Amino acid sequence: MAAPSLVDLEVLSVWRGLARGGLLEARRADLALADLQAIPIQRVDHTALLGRCWELRHNLTIYDAAYVALAEALQVTMLTGDQRLASAPGPTCPIEVSKANRHRPDVP
């Protein structure tokens, strides 16, 4: 499994919001951080992806474009929980929508 190196910052940003909203206890967040660091994800520097991210800017956020650009570069299927991302024009990699998305009621 591979992801742009920004994956960790995105996860922490979500957890910060949950913690500030009282939906994630500090102890659980600390344990989750250790779990995140232990996940065997190949974290790929996004610098080489910037050109493709910019090309995708009209249809995707730059953050989403980084994941798409990486999947394209690795010639693999991208896994997401975001149906809108999967339906957006521009990506050339296959995109599969996970059915395990519990936080987005708008995703089937």
Would you name each region that the model predicts?
Residues 4, 68-108:
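Acidic, PIN/NYN-like endoribonuclease modules and their adjacent C-terminal/linker elements
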Residues 10-17, 32-35, 52:
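A general alpha-helix detector
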Residues 39-81:
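Active-site neighborhoods of divalent-metal-dependent phosphate/nucleic-acid chemistry enzymes
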Residues 1-20, 42-46:
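PIN/NYN-family metal-dependent endoribonuclease catalytic core
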Residues 12, 36, 54, 88-90, ...:
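Short secondary-structure boundary/hinge segments and terminal tails
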